[in-house]
From Swiss-Prot:
The keyword Transcription does not apply. It holds the Pfam family Beta-prop_KIB1-4. It comes from Arabidopsis thaliana. It comes from the Eukaryota. Kelch repeats lie at residues 148-189, 190-234. Keywords: Kelch repeat, Repeat. This is F-box/kelch-repeat protein At1g57790. SMART domains: FBOX (SM00256). Residues 10-56 form the F-box domain.
Amino acid sequence: MSVNTNEGSKNLWKDLPLELLSSVMTFLEIKDNVRASVVCKSWFEAAVSVRVIDKSPWLMYFPETKNTYDFYDPSNCKKYTMELPKSLVGFIVRYSKDGWLLMSQEDSSHFVLFNPFTMDVVALPFLHLFTYYQLVGFSSAPTSSECVVFTIKDYDPGHVTIRTWSPGQTMWTSMQVESQFLDVDHNNVVFSNGVFYCLNQRNHVAVFDPSLRTWNVLDVPPPRCPDDKSWNEGKFMVGYKGDILVIRTYENKDPLVFKLDLTRGIWEEKDTLGSLTIFVSRKSCESRTYVKDGMLRNSVYFPELCYNEKQSVVYSFDEGRYHLREHDLDWGKQLSSDNIWIEPPKNAFELV
């Protein structure tokens, strides 16, 4: 007598207890979770039960008055307006991380960390700068013991000065290293894997480790890109689960995506983001694994609103096109833009 082992195997997998299936699904990346969900009804139920929807960042921008600021939530296309504390009127946004902003006066000497949802302000020690700093960022919210604020500047050829500050310190810590790295046009700084990654105009990467206080320029050739300076205008670096990605584009050109492969010492070009959604801006970028239905996955959201600030400009890799194609991204305008994506707290709707 013959036995249909294939049919038996199918039934065995289909009839696994929901608790066991759900336990297995928790170990899957989101793209594999989605694939598993189409196998059968029981797998769909298990996959969906453990699937975590990432809350999208909000776009924060300043009207011309500068006395207020607006939030735009791309998940529901709603806008919220809040009043800027009088003490921060005239301050400029430099960087964003974990729902906080690093801001400074025009001369860059007076830095503060500001939470635009709770209105909390943390003043940093005065920083003596004879000229404008070139890169700046911070590792985490100032409520964390791991918070490190980082600035870098080259005062003379062949040397860079790195300054750091952490909560509880009354002054900045300074160090100088030999390096020809600094030739930057945008603030491309990402904190990931416990270190700061910095990208310069020539698309070389340097790494600063705040715990070891070491600075190293990686021996990685720049990503291959059309030999056109315009491609430097739309250049963004973002971190995702330990990976470093660079997005490059200009005007209405399709974005190019590169992933840093430290093992092989190369930038690997990617033609898809999978289920990832990236939100880019001049000051800092955000990434989300699985945004809610109604938003575009495998896409890049730009810091530009149109149609009376009702919709954001998005490029979809699935469709190979920009949404709102007729709206040109003015990269020259974006260079000086204060528009920035920021992570809202869980209770954001109670605060705005």
